Amino acid sequence: MRDKIRLVSTAGTGFFYTTDKNKRNMPEKMEIKKFDPKIRKHVLFKEAKIK
């Protein structure tokens, strides 16, 4: 079962990516380093719910 999630920047810029993940294989919250174009750096993105 794949659920849609938001990956929100921890830099505080408000930038986010949308993606999906398989909750059966990854029950914990996703954390991944990705590029934040607002500050032009790679930062940690954390999972949040899509409203």
UniProtKB/Swiss-Prot annotation:
Belongs to the bacterial ribosomal protein bL33 family. The keyword Ribonucleoprotein applies. PANTHER family: 54S RIBOSOMAL PROTEIN L39, MITOCHONDRIAL, LARGE RIBOSOMAL SUBUNIT PROTEIN BL33M. GO terms for molecular function: structural constituent of ribosome. GO terms for cellular component: cytosolic large ribosomal subunit. SUPFAM superfamilies: Zn-binding ribosomal proteins (SSF57829). HAMAP family: Ribosomal_bL33. It holds the Pfam family Ribosomal_L33. It comes from the Bacteria. Keywords: Ribonucleoprotein, Ribosomal protein. GO terms for biological process: translation. This is Large ribosomal subunit protein bL33.
